[in-house]
């Protein structure tokens, strides 16, 4: 049945592979395969000159009007952008100070690429900000709206001039104000001013809100036509260009903008676009949930810590541990190579038999169970323990059944939702093949009483060694206690024997004395005859 589903998907959408999810009972984890990599290998720099013109010298002296309101907005935005630019320069000057890490992490908190990308982007922005570089870019755009300019450090950038607002102000708005003042009866002029001004105001707002570094590339920073032209100029293959053109939203999310500054009525900013240079290599995702064993009120719990995306690249395997390192579109996985960690090919052993793997599979340990749901591409893993209520359900009929304690894999073709207490998780509707690797949970090898306290990201064989050491200590303690008990028992027996011997000796003495008493002769006075002697001795 699963094979027929994959074949049907192939015929409908012509995918190069079918998504397959394998559940491993031994480790309470899933491995989902069938994805293809799209890996960022570089950055493409675009420098924009957003020209405003001499708007600061235009004034309205004939009372409130729509034109006057729009002029005030434009002037205030320009002043605000100059302030943001000055603050940005001050921050960049501190990049080499101990506060560097705080600045870079602040940029990442906004969702901007990686620390390395932000640092490199800021360094390039400092180069572009040099007076000679700004002039060179303006000269390259003197007779065209788009040109490739080479910076003094040899970096080639695509320069784009956006002069719609300047052209409108100089050729239409200024003559109209000079002729009729700001209170222009033609409402179309005010509407046109607002339309031409919208991009500038939105650019100011985005840089102001993000302290000079945007978290993505919006349509205001770079229109769709500008993005298409930039992608077509990227130094990569036609197949990769085609893939990026078909995933322009992803290119925007993975890019970012940096404010350069305001120069004589021109806002200069830089847009960094990712170049996705590696495609079609296999990728897979590992998801896990806590697995626990209970015995006599004690728990032994482990959780795989090698979760995340894995992609092969140039004969090696890159591991992307963080949730935001990769993003999925259909069966393509967009990842940033700078965020990847090269791991050994043997890491695959952890996906099949974690307890006998020679590779140091990383886990976390604990003695307190955690109930949770880990959503997978084709379903979900449920860890249900203690007094927590767990169930699966259907969007049509509600709860289907209650789940027992332990780890359970729920394929998305068996349920629509997973509920833990009052929290409901919606399963994906991605269609694919489901498999299960049978096996006894690895925690069955552990005695909860001997299980180590909470440990994070340790090799599983270290957990076994820790338990073995605990068992050895207990055995030695029992041996010592046994020897001590035997010693005490020997002493007690000796004392009892001595007491008994003492009693026997005492009884013997008493008996001897009594016998001697009975056999001793009596010494009485001699008996008299009753006669008295009358003799007289003189």
UniProtKB/Swiss-Prot annotation:
Similarity comment text for this entry: Belongs to the paramyxoviruses fusion glycoprotein family.
Protein name: Fusion glycoprotein F0
Organism: Turkey rhinotracheitis virus (TRTV)
Signal sequence extent: 1-18
Site positions (Cleavage): 102-103
Residue intervals annotated with topology Cytoplasmic: 511-538
Glycosylation site positions: 57, 353
Keyword Hydrolase applies: no
Keyword match Lipoprotein: yes
Residue stretches spanning the membrane: 490-510
Keywords: Cleavage on pair of basic residues, Coiled coil, Disulfide bond, Fusion of virus membrane with host cell membrane, Fusion of virus membrane with host membrane, Glycoprotein, Host cell membrane, Host Golgi apparatus, Host membrane, Lipoprotein, Membrane, Palmitate, Signal, Transmembrane, Transmembrane helix, Viral envelope protein, Viral penetration into host cytoplasm, Virion, Virus entry into host cell
Extracellular side: 19-489
Positions of S-palmitoyl cysteine lipidation: 513
Pfam families assigned to the protein according to its UniProt record, in alphabetical order: Fusion_gly (PF00523)
């Amino acid at each position: 049945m699963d094979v027929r589903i994959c074949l049907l998907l192939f015929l409908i959408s012509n995918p190069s592979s079918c998504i397959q999810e394998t559940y491993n009972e031994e480790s309470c984890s899933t491995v989902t395969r069938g994805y293809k990599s799209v890996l960022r290998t570089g950055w493409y720099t675009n420098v924009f000159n957003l020209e405003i013109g001499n708007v600061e010298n235009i004034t309205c002296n004939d009372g409130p009007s729509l034109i006057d309101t729009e002029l005030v907005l434009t002037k205030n935005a320009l002043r605000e952008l100059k302030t943001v630019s000055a603050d940005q320069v001050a921050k960049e000057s501190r990049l080499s100070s101990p506060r560097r890490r705080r600045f870079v992490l602040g940029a990442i908190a906004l969702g901007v690429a990686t620390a390395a990308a932000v640092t490199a982007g800021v360094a390039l922005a400092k180069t572009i900000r040099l007076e000679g570089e700004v002039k060179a870019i303006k000269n390259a755009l003197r007779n065209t709206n788009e040109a490739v300019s080479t910076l003094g450090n040899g970096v080639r950038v695509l320069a784009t001039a956006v002069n719609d607002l300047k052209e409108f102000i100089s050729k239409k708005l200024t003559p109209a104000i000079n002729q009729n003042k700001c209170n222009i009866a033609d409402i179309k002029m005010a509407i046109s001013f607002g339309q031409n001004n919208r991009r500038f105001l939105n650019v100011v707002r985005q840089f102001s809100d993000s302290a000079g570094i945007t978290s993505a590339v919006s349509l205001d920073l770079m229109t769709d036509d500008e993005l298409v032209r930039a992608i077509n100029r990227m130094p990569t293959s036609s197949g990769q260009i085609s893939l990026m053109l078909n995933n322009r939203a992803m290119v925007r999310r993975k890019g970012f903008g940096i404010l350069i500054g305001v120069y004589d009525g021109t806002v200069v900013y830089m847009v960094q676009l990712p170049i996705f240079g590696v495609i079609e290599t296999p990728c897979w995702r590992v998801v896990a949930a806590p697995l626990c064993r209970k015995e006599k009120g004690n728990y032994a719990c482990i959780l795989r810590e090698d979760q995340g995306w894995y992609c092969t690249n140039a004969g090696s395997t890159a591991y992307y541990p963080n949730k935001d390192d990769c993003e999925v579109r259909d069966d393509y996985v967009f990842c940033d190579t700078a965020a990847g960690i090269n791991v050994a090919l043997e890491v695959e052993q952890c996906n099949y038999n974690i307890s006998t793997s020679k590779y140091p599979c990383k886990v976390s340990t604990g003695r307190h169970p955690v109930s949770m749901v880990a959503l997978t591409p084709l379903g979900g893993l449920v860890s249900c323990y203690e007094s927590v209520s767990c169930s699966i359900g259907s969007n049509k009929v509600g709860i289907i059944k209650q789940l027992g304690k332990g780890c359970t894999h729920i394929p998305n073709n068996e349920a629509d939702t997973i509920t833990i207490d009052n929290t409901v998780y919606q399963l994906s509707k991605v269609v694919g093949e489901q498999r299960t690797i049978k096996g006894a949970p690895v925690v069955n090898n552990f005695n909860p009483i001997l299980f180590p306290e909470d440990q994070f990201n340790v090799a599983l064989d270290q957990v076994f060694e820790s338990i073995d050491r605990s068992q050895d200590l207990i055995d030695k303690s029992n041996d010592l206690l046994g020897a001590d008990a035997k010693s005490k028992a020997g002493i007690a027996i000796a004392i009892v024997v001595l007491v008994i011997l003492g009693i026997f000796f005492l009884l013997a003495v008493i008996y001897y004395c009594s016998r001697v008493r009975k056999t001793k002769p009596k010494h009485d006075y001699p008996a008299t005859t009753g006669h008295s002697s009358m003799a007289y001795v003189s």
